[in-house]
Curated annotation (Swiss-Prot):
It comes from the Eukaryota. It is a peripheral membrane protein. GO terms for cellular component: cytoplasm; nucleus; plasma membrane. PANTHER family: RAN BINDING PROTEIN 9-RELATED. This is Ran-binding protein 9. It comes from Xenopus tropicalis (Western clawed frog). Residues 1-14 have a biased composition (Low complexity). Residues 15-26 have a biased composition (Basic and acidic residues). The keyword Nucleus applies.
Length: 548
């Protein structure tokens, strides 16, 4: 007995958006049939006097074309009085008071005479009869639209050709005492369907490899590879590859290195430095893309919680005395990240005492979320006089440093979030009280920035949910092991990095996405389209199989 894969019955589940058949349908059966054992066992409960007493049941779903090859088995638990049983396929709407095969778009192999029935009441000799204890398999090949049966693990040959799409596995019974069990992959099959699947996979892959490709395809692929290396900032590799293939790099190497530098900052969680570097190298980029800037700022807030952003790391390494000096003077921290000095002075002047009450720190999440929900769910515009000067006097659109001259006062609440100082668990903002204070001020900046974006550009559900999710991290004493802790995973930086990189490329009139990636995506989309159009060979053409 061969053991089927997880899906157990088809070869191309990776493309199918529709569920395959897994059981018989209690809503798509004749009343003379009863179901049990998880809707896998069928028993006859009619009179069984004439052919008019026949009864059939269909599966819960049709066979998706993306399966490529679909197989199921039926074990005869009891042949009953006469063994008038049929196993096969039918489309939706076929009369269920008949055995499969007797009507149009219905196909069946019957146990009493071994005949196959193809949309007709007249059968054709096909295979042996079957009775109690036998296991009958039915295999639908959606590549060549054929069907064959098996008996006790042995193939009986092709039974039907030119099959229509959207067929349902079907079983029919006609006399008292007849009982059958279906196996849609829940258990190992008697027939070695995996060997048959491997045979067809080899055929399809050979067709793909033999497909002729005209034109100068090698040079085209080389250009695609070169653009991919340039896009992702692999400066040295791109230069070496271009030299070995006699190409010229489209983008200046200095520009590639600048993008590479920014990407490294983002991927290491140093969002403050990444934003500042972007503003220095591409002064108008974030000014023209306020939603992108907001995304970067939200990621910076998350990295502050994580303790990885340069700004909170800088504060965590300083004494409170030097912190006061930094926030009240024109000097920056050594890494040059704390650039919004005026706002820091404002924030720190509110809490000259270094020991800000922990409860006040911990209440920030509920308060921020409350205010965010308040303005986001209210269609009436808020009074905005105290924001009229924007976030920063030094920028034309008021978004670049993300601060407000007049911040909304946050209400106190009783909810407390623990700032854990134990050694057995990671600590909020790296365990620095000063860094937590800065994070809270930064959270207020983000909230104000979100409000201004809404007033000037309208509602944005993506921005709203992004900020709510980020603030939700503060609702847990251990954000890393919370339901929203996935945000702290370094892999979440990759999407932000990609968005920023694409925006930089756009201002250089270079593709936002590398042609190689677009080609792979197009191939994947073509396979999905093939599945939707009922072309079963798509099941054996996984793009991933050709990436080495």
């Amino acid at each position: 007995m061969s053991s089927p894969p997880l899906h157990g019955l088809s070869s191309g589940g990776h493309l199918s958006r529709d569920p395959p058949p897994r059981s018989w349908s209690p809503r798509d059966k004749c009343s003379y049939l009863g179901l049990s054992h998880g809707n896998l066992r069928v028993h006859y409960k009619g009179h069984g006097k004439t052919s008019k007493d026949a009864a059939s049941v269909r599966s819960t779903h049709p066979i998706p074309a993306a399966c490529g090859i679909f197989y199921f088995e039926v074990k005869i638990i009891s042949k009953g009085r006469d063994g008038y049983m049929g196993i096969g396929l039918s489309t939706q709407g076929v009369n269920l008071s008949r055995l499969p095969g007797w009507d149009k778009h219905s196909y069946g192999y019957h146990g009493d005479d071994g005949h196959s029935f193809c949309s007709s009441g007249t059968g054709q000799p096909y295979g042996p009869t079957f009775t109690t204890g036998d296991v009958i398999g039915c295999c639908v090949n959606l590549i060549d639209n054929t069907c064959f049966y098996t008996k006790n693990g042995h193939s009986l040959g092709i039974a039907f050709t030119d099959l229509p799409p959207n067929l349902y596995p079907t079983v029919g019974l006609q006399t008292p005492g007849e009982v059958v069990d279906a196996n849609f992959g829940q258990s190992p099959f008697v027939f070695d369907i995996e060997d048959y699947i491997r045979e067809w996979r080899t055929k399809i892959q050979a067709q793909i490899e033999r497909f002729p490709v005209g034109g100068e395809w090698q040079s085209m692929i080389q250009r695609m590879v070169s653009s991919y290396l340039v896009h992702h900032g692999y400066c040295s590799t791109a230069e070496a590859f271009a030299k070995s293939t006699d190409q010229t790099v489209q983008e200046e190497l200095a520009s590639i290195k600048n993008r590479q530098r920014i990407q490294k900052l983002v991927l290491s969680g140093r969002m403050g430095e990444a934003i500042e570097t972007t503003q220095q190298l591409y002064p108008s980029l974030l000014e023209r893309n306020p939603n992108l800037l907001f995304t970067l700022k939200v990621r910076q807030f998350i990295e502050m919680v994580n303790g990885t952003d340069s700004e909170v790391r800088c504060l965590g390494n300083r004494s409170l005395k030097s912190l006061d000096g930094c926030s009240g003077s024109d000097s920056n921290c050594s890494n040059g990240i704390i650039s919004n000095k005026a706002h820091q002075t404002h924030c720190h002047s509110k809490s000259q005492s270094s020991n800000l009450n922990v409860t006040e720190l911990n209440s920030i999440n509920m308060t921020m979320s409350h205010q965010l929900n308040s303005y986001s769910s209210n269609d009436v515009e808020m009074e905005t006089d105290h924001y009229s000067n924007g976030f920063s006097a030094s920028t034309s659109n008021g978004f670049l440093n993300g601060s407000s001259r007049h911040e909304p006062e946050l209400e106190e609440c009783d909810t407390e979030m623990e700032v854990d100082t134990s050694h057995g668990r990671r600590q909020l903002c790296g365990g620095s009280q000063a860094a937590v204070e800065r994070m809270i001020c930064f959270g207020r900046e983000l909230q104000a920035m979100s409000e201004q974006l809404r007033r000037e550009r309208g509602k944005n559900a993506t921005n709203k949910n992004m900020l709510k999710d980020a603030f939700s991290l503060l609702a847990y004493s251990d954000p890393w092991n919370s339901p929203v802790g996935y945000q702290l995973d370094p892999i979440q930086r990759e999407h932000v990095c990609s968005s920023l990189n694409s925006a930089i490329l756009d201002i250089h009139n270079l593709p936002k996405q590398p042609p190689l990636s677009l080609a792979l995506e197009q191939a994947s989309q073509c396979l999905e389209m093939m599945a939707q159009c009922g072309i079963g060979s798509c099941a054996f053409a996984r793009v991933a199989d050709y990436l080495h």
